[in-house]
Swiss-Prot record:
This is Peptidase B. One of its GO terms (biological process) is proteolysis. The keyword Protease applies. The keyword Manganese applies. The gene is pepB. PANTHER family: LEUCINE AMINOPEPTIDASE-RELATED, PEPTIDASE B. It is found in: Cytoplasm. GO terms for molecular function: manganese ion binding; metalloaminopeptidase activity. Binds 2 manganese ions per subunit.
Length: 428
């Protein structure tokens, strides 16, 4: 084992020999990070990425100034999808160390799950991983049901079945109930719905390779929302919450769904499929119908839903949509408290009407006349939320995954959003 490289924090500028703008320097004891009070967490994260890039795989966070957020910022930048890294953590009080350990367990689970190859992580494996994580943190407070394959069709989960039927790996719906009250009749405070497309080829509206090569990550919404529930539980969540993960492959085969197909949903809506690559909304619709039936105070869905959201925000922000201004502001306040980036994008009543079909009530994609793709996707989902004006948040997870490394992140999953959603769930 190599000797650990000591990483210390300093509020003094680097020696002039390192340059006027140096944010880190090397000394006899190791590496010093020079904080300037402007963006200390970002500075630490970017420095950690550089340290990893230097091939230093064993570090000790030493000296004064470290806390949970600073240690976590270092790990966020230091962690990568290849190889092993060892960190000797700074001395923290019990509460801070517990918080750090829970982040390391749960948010690393999210990142590792999203990074897993599609060959290893099919719909059933994703659902089971979620069950294992949540049972691990909540034990007997969790119960669940897994419905898959033809059972979905027989129970009229036709959006999920339609999308997933083209794969040899059957589609799966995980319905999980976290009930810490011990009362089977306790009201459901929140329902969480996640898109779990474990590989998205685009179906017959096939993607080009440049857009398909990262589609193992199209289950990022399901992983993020699962991690958020687990993390909220570690922070003391004492209300009943239900989780719905809509898991499927979107592949091409003789049994795959086709353009022009019409899906009949349980809430009476009919949807014409005019783009098989707009499949995420089709599976989420089934989860949102179940969520609405619980009459919760809060519904949150999370999905890597549209390229339009990434075009607007890049990979730095998650996109937020809601008709409920007060609730949207609460989510944004939670994001600020957790140092995570969310940005609200427009969602208006007219977006619900920008999905015309000649053969069904809705089209699953907007036409060229309605180019606001992220907003029309959110508008589509609203048709499956009973009281869409109040208590519903849609998160288009633009910041879930990066195809290549940048100065603060390795390539792959980020884990962003977990803490914000958990904060919102435990804020009241």
């Amino acid at each position: 084992m190599t000797e650990a490289m000591k990483i210390t924090l300093s509020t003094l500028p680097a020696d002039a020999r390192w340059g006027e703008k140096a944010t880190w320097s090397i000394n006899n004891d190791g590496i010093a990070l020079h904080l300037n009070g402007k963006d200390d967490l970002g500075l630490i994260q970017r420095a950690a990425r550089k340290i990893d890039g230097m091939g230093i795989k064993h570090v000790a966070l030493s000296g004064e100034g470290w806390n949970t957020d600073r240690a976590w910022a270092f790990w966020a930048g230091y962690k990568g999808p290849k190889g092993q890294r060892q960190v000797e953590w700074p001395t923290l009080d019990d509460a801070q160390r517990s918080e750090l350990d829970n982040r390391l367990t749960i948010i690393d689970w999210v990142r590792d799950t999203i990074n897993a190859p599609a060959e290893e992580l099919g719909p059933e494996q994703l659902a089971q991983r979620a069950v294992d994580l949540l049972c691990g943190v909540a034990g007997e407070k969790v119960s669940y049901r897994i419905t898959k394959g033809e059972d979905l069709r027989e129970q009229n989960y036709l959006g999920l079945h339609t999308v997933g039927r083209g794969s040899e790996r059957p589609p799966v719906l995980l319905a999980l109930d976290y009930n810490p009250t011990g009362d089977k009749d306790a009201p459901v405070y929140a329902c969480l719905v996640g898109k779990g497309i474990t590989f998205d080829s685009g179906g017959y509206s096939i993607k080009q390779s440049a857009f398909m090569d990262s589609m193992k990550s199209d289950m990022g919404g399901a992983a993020t929302i699962t991690g958020a529930l687990a993390f909220a539980i570690t922070r003391g969540l004492n209300k009943r919450v239900k989780l719905y993960l809509c898991c499927a492959d979107n592949l091409i085969s003789g049994n795959a769904f086709k353009l022009g197909d019409i899906i009949h949903y349980r809430n009476g809506k009919t949807v014409e499929v005019m783009n098989t690559d707009a499949e995420g909304r089709l599976v989420l619709a089934d989860g949102l119908i179940d969520a609405s039936a619980q009459k919760p105070a809060l519904i949150i869905d999370a999905a890597t839903l549209t390229g339009a959201a990434k075009t607007a925000l890049g990979n730095d922000y998650h996109a937020l949509f809601s008709f409920d201004d007060a609730l949207a502001n609460r989510l944004l306040a939670s994001a600020q408290a957790e140092n995570e980036a969310f940005w609200r994008l427009p969602l208006a009543e007219f977006h619900r009407n920008q999905l015309p079909s000649n053969f069904a009530e809705l089209n699953n994609t907007g036409s060229a006349a309605y180019p606001a793709g992220a907003s029309t996707a959110a508008g589509f989902l609203s048709h499956f939320v009973e009281n869409y004006h109040q208590g519903w948040l849609h998160i288009d997870c633009s910041a879930t995954y990066r195809k290549s490394a940048v100065e603060q992140w390795s390539a792959g999953a980020t884990g962003l959003g977990v803490r914000t959603i958990a904060n919102l769930l435990t804020a009241e």
